[in-house]
Amino acid sequence: MQPDLHCRTLAAHTLKHFRALSPLTHCMTNDVVQTFTANTLLALGASPAMVIDPVEARPFAAIANALLVNVGTLTASRADAMRGAVESAYDAKTPWTLDPVAVGALEFRRRFCLDLLSLRPAAIRGNASEILALSGMALGGRGVDTTEAALAALPAAQALARQIDCIVVVTGEVDYVTNGQRTLSIPGGDPLMTRIVGTGCALSAVVAASCALPGAALDNVASACCWMKLAGQAAAERSEGPGSFIPAFLDALYHLDVEAANATN
């Protein structure tokens, strides 16, 4: 099935709801991107909470609006905390999102992520290599880097979405968002987004937060991808390189006006 182009008008409408709700988003993410992830959510209007201790993570997941599990710096003790939080979220019907960082390259995290799939994530966000590996169609990748184009992983993403009954996001130059039956494409962004650490991980947090919104999950998640792409483009226009890109990106998210961006493109 061919992907449809995501509607920016819908993304603008969704952003208004997102800012009004300010989803409390429980981020169990990797050590490298904690600050950037929290600042990304804050800039868009969400409320991040970086609760990782096993004693606290389980009860907090039940009161949050959304949960993110990112396995980038996975350890055995952190895996236990994440599993407890996911079980709590599942019982409380809190939507949770999986970011299977480098899942095709390392066996421990691959087995951990596969085990978590039985607890029905609302969304999965990864690059092409990660989605191919999680679906069982291929292993590999270079850590957080992909060795495949996003479009090459689309059949795997669609199959995984049908298998788990969730939204799957494959990110790249064009992002693809699918529920297994319908697929949306989101072009845009800028190559500078790949020259700093954390844009993909931060997107996963925004995806997680968007899953707390009412309405169609496919459209909400695609809107989250659209916001990040638009902010990346705007930030790149005002940046001289990676160092100046990061603050410009956060400013672009804070001032994001999808309707205005739509009118100028």
Curated annotation (Swiss-Prot):
EC number: 2.7.1.50
Catalyzed reaction equations: 5-(2-hydroxyethyl)-4-methylthiazole + ATP = 4-methyl-5-(2-phosphooxyethyl)-thiazole + ADP + H(+)
Ligand binding (substrate): M50, G198
InterPro entries named in the record: Hyethyz_kinase (IPR000417), Ribokinase-like (IPR029056)
Protein's recorded name: Hydroxyethylthiazole kinase
Positions contributing to ATP binding: R125, T171
Keywords: ATP-binding, Kinase, Magnesium, Metal-binding, Nucleotide-binding, Thiamine biosynthesis, Transferase
Family: Belongs to the Thz kinase family.
Organism: Salmonella agona (strain SL483)
Gene from which the chain derives: thiM
